């Protein structure tokens, strides 16, 4: 996944930008970046966050970067934001999305005279750079964004920062969210709605599918109207979204309670657990919803050790990721031994980690372990 945040204010915005981007750390584990525009022009910083959290890596940059307009991101893939110089002028761009027809789009830009792209490790092309190249094929940034929305097979939500403001564009089917917040002397734009709440912003606008707005320190202007066809990612409520966020007016935590409640209604009279538990972190709210509806006791038979195992430290190697996941879970023997446990997870994708967690509980003395996924069975892979 990935997430981003932008600010256009009448005064220096770097602290709001820094904390706003940091509030998206649950959406990515590989790279973070910030770009600002001020009296000294454009400034940018990009760092790896694989072994250290965003805040730690960017503390020095906060002291050095200045500007009243800024954008930043947390990314699981390419380094960004990128600084672009073109016939449209200078701008910075950051994206959240997935391009399924990348090779076909590369052929389009090559055939139109684009000679090269910067290659990333593994021979991959930076998708954000490709998006910028496609935008620059048109006469204005807005026309370029519309062109990208039409031509990409996949999803693409983006922020583009000029020397005067920020263009914010939501994916054409609204698969990923985009919110605008407002306070007295600034506007912000964010993937996560909760990211600006602690900084004095209030909700101003949630963009619709394919909608484009232009944000300056003084105003928010709709430059391309929203479309009606909405296909938002349901996994935002199940897994990706932070509990305090809301999408399309529906809070993540409340939705997870409802999922757990519906599971309990379906199970009524078929199981009598001693303990209802959730797999940390996203399974916990589902389990609370189940326990509240069923009347069975909610407890934490195992607890995730977080002081030295933050989510931002997650190796890219799958075997190492699974080992780290195991090491995080610490059992509470008195809540496991000779107990019938009902374990609720947000979903089952590969099933590897859930199987190991179940074995872990049995090895810790559980009498029975029953598993309930809060998400319906995943029958087809999502290409977005």
What are the residue ranges of the model-derived segments?
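Short, glycine/charge-rich flexible loops or terminal/linker lids adjacent to PRPP-binding catalytic cores
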Residues: 295-341, 379-384
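Secondary-structure transition/capping motifs at alpha-helix termini
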Residues: 268-273, 292-299, 333-337, 359-368
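Conserved short alpha-helical segments that host acidic/polar catalytic motifs at enzyme active sites
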Residues: 1-208, 214-274, 279, 368
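Flexible loop/turn segments at secondary-structure boundaries
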Residues: 12, 101, 175-176, 196-197, ...
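Extended, hydrophobic alpha-helical segments in both membrane/secreted and soluble proteins
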Residues: 276, 283-290, 294, 298, ...
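A short, conserved beta-to-alpha structural element at the edge of catalytic cores
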Residues: 359-384
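A short acidic (Asp/Glu
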Residues: 44-46, 170-171, 286-289, 381-383
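An acidic- and aromatic-residue-enriched active-site/binding cleft used to recognize and process polar
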Residues: 163, 171-172, 281, 303-304, ...
């Amino acid at each position: 996944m990935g997430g981003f945040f932008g600010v256009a204010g009448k005064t220096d915005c770097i602290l709001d930008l820094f904390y706003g981007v940091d509030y998206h750390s649950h959406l990515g584990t590989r790279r973070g970046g910030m770009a600002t525009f001020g009296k000294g022009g454009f400034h940018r910083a990009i760092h790896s966050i694989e072994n250290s959290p965003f805040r730690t890596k960017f503390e020095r940059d906060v002291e050095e970067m200045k500007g009243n307009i800024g954008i930043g991101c947390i990314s699981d893939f390419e380094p960004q934001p990128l600084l672009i110089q073109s016939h449209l002028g200078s701008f910075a761009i950051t994206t959240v999305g997935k391009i399924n027809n990348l090779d076909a789009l590369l052929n389009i830009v090559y055939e139109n005279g684009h000679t090269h792209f910067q290659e990333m490790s593994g021979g991959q092309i930076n998708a954000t750079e490709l998006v910028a190249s496609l935008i620059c094929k048109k006469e204005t940034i807005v026309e370029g964004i519309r062109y990208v929305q039409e031509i990409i097979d996949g999803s693409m939500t983006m922020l583009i920062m000029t020397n005067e403001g920020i263009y914010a564009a939501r994916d054409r089917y609204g698969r990923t969210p985009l919110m605008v917040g407002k306070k007295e002397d600034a506007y912000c734009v964010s993937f996560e709605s909760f990211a600006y709440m602690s900084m004095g912003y209030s909700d101003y606008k949630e963009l619709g599918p394919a909608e484009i707005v232009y944000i300056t320190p003084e105003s928010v202007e709709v430059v391309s109207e929203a479309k009606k066809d909405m296909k938002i990612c349901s996994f935002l409520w199940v897994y990706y979204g932070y509990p305090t966020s809301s999408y399309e007016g529906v809070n993540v935590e409340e939705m997870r309670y409802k999922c757990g409640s519906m599971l309990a209604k379906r199970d009524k009279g078929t199981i009598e657990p001693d303990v209802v538990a959730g797999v940390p972190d996203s399974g916990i709210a589902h389990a609370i919803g189940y326990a509240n509806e069923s009347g069975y006791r909610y407890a934490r038979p195992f607890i995730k050790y977080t002081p030295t195992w933050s989510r931002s430290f997650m190796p890219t190697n799958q075997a190492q990721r699974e080992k780290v996941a195991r090491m995080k879970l610490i059992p509470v023997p008195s809540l496991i031994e000779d107990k019938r446990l009902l374990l609720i997870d947000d979903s089952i994708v590969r099933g590897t980690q859930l199987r190991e967690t179940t074995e872990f509980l049995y090895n810790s003395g559980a009498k029975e372990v029953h598993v309930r996924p809060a998400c319906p069975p995943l029958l087809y892979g999502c290409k977005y």
